[in-house]
A protein has these predicted regions:
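Adenosine-cofactor binding site in Rossmann-like domains, unifying the SAM/SAH pocket
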Residues: 23-43
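NAD(P)H-binding glycine-rich loop region in Rossmannoid oxidoreductase-like domains
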Residues: 37-73, 84-86
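Conserved Rossmann-fold NAD(P)-dependent oxidoreductase catalytic core, especially the SDR/UDP-sugar
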Residues: 80-115
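Glycine-rich NAD(P)-binding loop of the Rossmann-fold in SDR/ketoreductase-type enzymes
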Residues: 35, 65, 69-80, 114, ...
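Alpha-helical substrate-binding/gating segment
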Residues: 137, 143-150, 160-188
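N-terminal Rossmann NAD(P)H-binding glycine-rich loop of SDR-like oxidoreductase domains
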Residues: 2-22
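Active-site Tyr-X1-5-Lys
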Residues: 87, 115-144
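Mid/C-terminal beta-alpha module of Rossmann-like enzyme folds, strongest
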Residues: 172, 179-218, 222
Length: 235
């Protein structure tokens, strides 16, 4: 079998890091428009090890203001890929998000009931359902990551996450891929505040308290299942 992977969204932050860690093809949006089944079908003539689906409209505000477009990409795009991958007996690895949870309780496990707090989270959850329904061989990875720069002078001390920087999360995802894990998995690093995360790359970051009652302050994922499955593997 070919050891090469097919990656959608390869030009994004996560895709850029995965390209450095895996042998893969990363067609452009023009070459591989996931909303056009006829256009993407040609790429599946090759024998890939798996399809890694990253492409999405991930800007929450843009998604909320362009609901039809984000549904087309984030939901119907998943449907198109899952159906074709299933026809080819190809495993699909879908990168989902912690935004499928409301962010109120925290420590969300794979068995907790999703309840998205916004339209972006809804479309990503609907994408998960498309993968589950249309594909026989799948892995859904719920995770969250940050670019390698904290873009603000302050960071919240009372908002908690299991996210980490993209270079860290990309390596965790590659471990998951290479272990050929099936089904649903939450990937991240231990719970920390935004301030603690920001301090990892900027020691001069200032503290701030989030006083917005509607802001999701506990979106961290339970990663116990992942810790058991990953073992001591490193990239």
């Amino acid at each position: 079998m070919n050891e090469k992977y097919l990656i959608t969204g390869g030009s994004g932050k996560l895709g850029t890091h995965l390209k450095e860690l895996l042998s893969c093809d990363t067609p452009t949006h023009q070459e591989f428009d996931i909303t056009d089944p006829k256009k993407i079908r040609n790429y599946f003539n090759q024998d890939y090890k798996a399809l890694i689906h990253l492409a999405a409209i991930s800007d929450q505000h843009y998604a909320a203001n362009h609901q039809e477009e984000s549904y087309l990409v984030n939901v119907l795009g998943c449907r198109n890929l899952a159906k074709i991958a299933n026809e080819k007996n190809l495993k699909i690895i879908y990168i989902s998000t912690d935004y499928i949870f409301p962010g109120t309780a925290g420590n969300y496990s794979e068995t907790d009931h999703p309840s998205p707090a916004n339209w972006y989270g809804y479309t990503k959850l609907a994408g998960e359902y498309e993968i589950r329904l249309k594909s026989q061989k799948w892995c859904i990875i719920r995770t969250s990551f940050r670019p390698l720069k904290w873009g603000f002078p302050t960071a919240f001390t009372n908002v908690f996450t299991s996210a980490d920087y993209v270079d860290v999360i990309s390596k965790e995802i590659v471990i998951c891929i290479k272990k050929n894990i099936q089904g649903l998995i939450h990937i991240g690093t231990p719970k920390k505040s935004f301030f603690e995360l920001a301090r990892k790359i900027n020691k001069n970051i200032k503290t701030e308290i989030c006083n917005d009652p509607n802001f999701p302050k506990n979106r961290d994922l339970c990663i116990e299942k992942w810790k058991k499955l990953r073992g001591n593997n490193e990239i």
